[in-house]
């Protein structure tokens, strides 16, 4: 089946007819194109399904042991320089192809219903298809120049989708923030590519892997410059994957439609940075210090993301910080050299996070009928609660995604996260301790999100009552403690405050908009029984529930592909290792070594205990009023007033303020970095206008007045000109003689 590999070059081009056809249709036949808009959604799903089948065949060939395949077209510019374009198929490529296509198909089916009321429906599907095409081109690229081209296209599509509702100021600002932040990473990536080309004379992966290794082994090149170039490449990945300190764009990217948030966080933009590090992994492993830098950035990011998610009120922002933290785990694994564990967690996290984001979209969709179209209200967990009664199917899927991300067996993320935690103990006890602590924080904030959304009562109907205030530790509740906001130049530092300023008046959905709403192109009847009301939240349509059902299946079973074999030989689901054999033979000579039952159970028991402890704390702090956790004598003992209680309140308040204000990092950038750049720009403008132009204009003005003076003195007579000429000559001679 060699032709399967030879035809792989067409993969990025298969989705392209959709945006082209939509663009031409809107230009030439706008009315007809809008009337048949469901057809475009159908073909978007169909073409991506073809790529998925193609990807599955390629993956099966890789698992069966087929070698890495590369096909290149060379464009010779002159005798000394040529550009090569082609496709590169290896296990990493096949993994990314399956992730992009499977998650992309579910998001497209979901989006048909979610975006059906939106006037930008066609524009959305055009962007989405081009986004998928760009990401597919990125993962099949055979050299760094090709990667950079598709890297920029992926970034462009993400900016368009983040700012999809560009008439909203927050969305426009978020789009600009993502653009500027990623410009830093993209420029660094470009410099790193040029530096590597200057060193190796090639853009091909295999060429500069071998050349760089030979140069280092033979001390044939400046190791500092090579380290600098690889560090610049890594900065590009840091920005794209929202790693510290270039993570600030990710929470604001939630201003885009929820389906695109699911795609960005699961399989496209943020995965692009991880893909770049994984693709260049052979280069990073032979460069001194760079692996330590990758691990350090990963450990900082996973802890920072977890702490910033602790007190967020917006359900999508909470999930965004969760993504940031989980990508930190993947980056940590790559920095430790755990290539297999990193890709394993990339796979499991993608499906779990797609499930959570699409579940949050179902929640937001149902809340909009109660609070109106307002992201500040429909995405605010303070106004939710008790949704189990109204959206039981969404609740079940969201709970399974939450448990998976918490690391509860046998769900997907348990297997991959547990492997990363085990490897971290071998790398650094300090890093391992932080990673385990963050695992507990992950369980806490994820279950906090679930409890605030689905348990208790619908808070919008009882705004002045919160069951959490009955808790002794109400100071970190969603409603907060009496306080104030300090507003400084459009940026505010929020302290613990009550939520009385929230207005419950909402815009009502336009009747004409509802009557003209298009039905989804896929109708799934008699699977789920949904009852809609317009005074309470309701369960989503079957077209939105079907992707949740499919992703639940992935969340249940995808983890089994990476279970390592045991000594007893009772489990043999080591599909992932067989899949990755061509890529990791040179990295882990002993990767086939298996764990015994005892070691596995001890490690699993430890990680699961941490997760359950975080869940217990979340139940204690955010459980509903009828929760039996509030009646424990032990808890009553801890919440008694006293000096220790006051100190504990202060600690909790500081943690809350740190988390809710995003660690003050955005404020630091706004007050120091952005203000400093603007101040420098103002000074440069002043210096240019007042000093530089002042000197130039001053010389002109002085020359003008001198000329005018001489003109009137001379009077136009030749005798006067001769007199002044002789006078100047005499002065010149006197000066010279002296």
Swiss-Prot record:
InterPro entries reported for this sequence: NADH_UbQ_OxRdtase_chlpt_su5_C (IPR002128), NADHpl_OxRdtase_5_subgr (IPR018393), ND/Mrp_TM (IPR001750), NU5C-like (IPR003945), Proton_antipo_N (IPR001516)
GO cellular component: chloroplast thylakoid membrane
Gene3D superfamilies xrefs: 1.20.5.2700
Origin: domain of life: Eukaryota
Key word Membrane present: yes
Uppermost EC category: translocase
Catalytic activity, as annotated: a plastoquinone + NADH + (n+1) H(+)(in) = a plastoquinol + NAD(+) + n H(+)(out); a plastoquinone + NADPH + (n+1) H(+)(in) = a plastoquinol + NADP(+) + n H(+)(out)
Topology of this chain in the membrane: Multi-pass membrane protein
Chief place where the protein resides: plastid
EC number(s) stated in the UniProt entry for this protein: 7.1.1.-
A single BP term in Gene Ontology: ATP synthesis coupled electron transport
Family recorded in the similarity comment: Belongs to the complex I subunit 5 family.
Known partners and oligomeric status: NDH is composed of at least 16 different subunits, 5 of which are encoded in the nucleus.
Protein name, per record: NAD(P)H-quinone oxidoreductase subunit 5, chloroplastic
Organism for this UniProt entry: Ranunculus macranthus
